[in-house]
Amino acid sequence: MRFTPGVVAVGGLRISELVGLTWAQVIRRDSGEAQLEVVGKGDKVRQVLIPAVIAARLFASRGDAPASAPVFESVRNPGHALTDRAVNFIVKAAARRAGVNPAASVHWLRHAHASHAIDNGAPITLVSATLGHADLKTTSVYAHARPGESSGRYLKTK
């Protein structure tokens, strides 16, 4: 498949998880979403959902690739996964074309995933599980207090 930074952005994957992903780890759900069985740090497996619109691109690109094939195959080295370097090059090029942060990387997209999910109301525990963090403190780095906001707004008062 042609690599798409969208998978990283919506999945919050680490680069090692991305380049190690095989078709055996991509499961089509009835909803049209893709469920990724991601092998993270310490060989811990977690499930990450990819929205249907991006999942459709994934499934359409598979062709007759066997379950053991990398999802993101190298064009220069068929049968092998993209390298970390190639993935970050693609992310930087896409960021340049989109006019966003020229320092973009897979880690930057992972950070953006966490920050935007939390800002849009996702529970920090869910974000932590999605990212594969063993400690909630790690995820809390991505939670930013916004000017003009106060936790008092979330308390029930009479």
Predicted features along the sequence, with ranges:
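Basic, Lys/Arg- and aromatic-enriched nucleic-acid-binding interface segment
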Residues: 1-15, 19, 44, 64
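Short alpha-helical segment immediately N-terminal to, or the first helix within
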Residues: 7-8, 21, 116-117, 130
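Short coil/turn motifs that cap or connect alpha-helices
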Residues: 14, 22-24, 101, 123, ...
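Conserved tyrosine-mediated DNA breakage-rejoining catalytic core shared by Y-recombinases
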Residues: 16, 20-58
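Catalytic-site neighborhood detector that most strongly recognizes the C-terminal catalytic loop/helix
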Residues: 42, 131-156
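Short, basic (Lys/Arg/His-rich) helix/loop patches that form interaction surfaces
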Residues: 48, 67, 88-129, 144
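Active-site/catalytic core of tyrosine-dependent DNA strand-transfer enzymes
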Residues: 51-101
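Ser/Thr-centric signal marking residues that sit
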Residues: 83, 105, 115, 138-139
